[in-house]
């Protein structure tokens, strides 16, 4: 006999009920275990941070549904990465915004050095503009022969201008012979330039000479030497010291009584004289 369709329906309805009854105690046991886990975690993490609380909530939600746990983990990872990136960006911005004191000092030194160099250059340029370099009025003549004298140089170089001074050092051993060079100083720099153009490489006494311009040295006053302070002579040693002035004064000499001379009679002297003369005559 085939079962009736009504019985089949009843059986099919009874099966899901039984399955629901079986699932209900399993769900209750799982919920109890979850509650116990939550209590334990709360006790252990009573002094924990907000991060531990969020992790406990995420773990409880992950037990209920795997999809929600994966979403929370991804969101927490993204939040961590975002916080780390924000902290890095803030640190980099802080470091870039406020440089270290050593860098500041280095930058200040560079700026001061560059300023000092630029100031020096400008000062030098201003000095050059204010005081132009003086033109030379003195010439150095080299490679002169020993036959050339002061008078020869005077005759030759006086044609180019008025000569102020001629210096021709002579040899020590031979005072009438020059050392082979001389100095000629003109009153105006134009005359000196003219003589330099014509006589540099010219010939005197059959020999080619050299002429070069020289700036005349300014005679500077010699610096005054401060006389050293006079030092008192050191005191003589104790054994050489003279007595004080009071002792130097010689006391008035004591009056001594005149020595009494013994009065002698002249007779004994005469006798002696006579005796001596008599003795001499007898001899």
Swiss-Prot record:
Residues 10-36 have a biased composition (Basic and acidic residues). The keyword Zinc-finger does not apply. Residues 102-119, 242-276 have a biased composition (Basic residues). Residues 137-216 form the RRM domain. Residues 1-141, 217-283 are annotated as: Disordered. Pfam families: RRM_1. Component of the active spliceosome. Belongs to the splicing factor SR family. This is RNA-binding protein with serine-rich domain 1. It comes from Danio rerio (Zebrafish). The gene is rnps1.
């Amino acid at each position: 006999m085939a079962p009736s369709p009504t019985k089949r329906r009843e059986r099919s309805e009874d099966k899901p009920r039984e399955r629901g009854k079986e699932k209900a105690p399993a769900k209750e046991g799982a919920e109890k275990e979850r509650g116990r886990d939550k209590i334990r975690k709360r006790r252990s993490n009573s002094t924990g941070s907000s991060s531990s609380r969020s992790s406990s909530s995420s773990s409880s939600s992950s037990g209920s549904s795997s999809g929600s746990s994966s979403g929370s983990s991804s969101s927490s990872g993204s939040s961590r990465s975002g916080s780390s990136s924000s902290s890095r960006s803030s640190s980099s911005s802080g470091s870039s915004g406020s440089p270290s004191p050593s860098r500041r000092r280095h930058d200040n030194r560079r700026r001061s050095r560059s300023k000092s160099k630029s100031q020096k250059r400008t000062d030098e340029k201003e000095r050059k503009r204010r005081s132009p370099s003086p033109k030379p009025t003195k010439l150095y003549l080299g490679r002169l022969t020993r036959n050339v004298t002061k008078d020869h140089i005077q005759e030759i170089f006086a044609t180019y201008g008025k000569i102020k001074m001629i210096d021709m050092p002579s040899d020590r051993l031979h005072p009438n012979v020059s050392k082979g060079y001389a100095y000629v100083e003109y009153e105006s720099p134009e005359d000196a330039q003219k003589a330099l153009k014509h006589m540099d490489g010219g010939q005197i006494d059959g020999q080619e000479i050299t002429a070069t311009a020289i700036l005349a040295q300014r005679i500077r006053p010699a610096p005054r030497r401060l006389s050293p302070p006079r030092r008192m002579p050191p005191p003589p040693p104790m054994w050489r010291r003279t007595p004080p002035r009071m002792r130097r004064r010689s006391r008035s000499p004591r009056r001594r009584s005149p020595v009494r001379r013994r009065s002698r009679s002249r007779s004994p002297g005469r006798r002696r004289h006579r005796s001596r003369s008599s003795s001499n005559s007898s001899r």
